[in-house]
């Protein structure tokens, strides 16, 4: 069950190994060892000092023309809060790209019309961080949508929930050139206060999550 949910992250880790993700099973991190609030803020201030304008959001998409490349991307940028409040903002998140992974056709059609959004992410720096690189867990906050769809054309409150990578920490280099990246996944869709089972990954129908990777854009 768990392996199915993290298969995408395994694939992305192979495809983009150059991004230097660090395993969540890093030696010395027992799960009970945390940074002090002062240490946490110190790392967050150091991360916020960087510029992250040339970024990309990679996401799963069905590609019948090239089954070995089931990933697409959009340009993005990131700003990390300078207040040490564990938040960063990712721009141009492609909400419409989720449509192909939604089994409810009416909802999928409505999602396909949603414009890209800037979304806030919460993050927490991990104790295995160094003076060179901050390792962290990050996840977008829920996206709330008011959508009108269906044969009755009724308004529905739709909430998209995400989870962080179950395998790898995100990373942020603290010296130039700055490199930043983390993985996450769409995990649940709620409609009008009820959890649904509408997520059906178009690249793997047994997958009930949709994977994303946020990182520096490759130089052309």
Regions found by a protein language model. Give the residues of each.
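First exposed extracellular module after export/assembly in secreted or surface-exposed proteins
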Residues: 34-220
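Bacterial Sec-dependent N-terminal signal peptides
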Residues: 3-48, 218-220
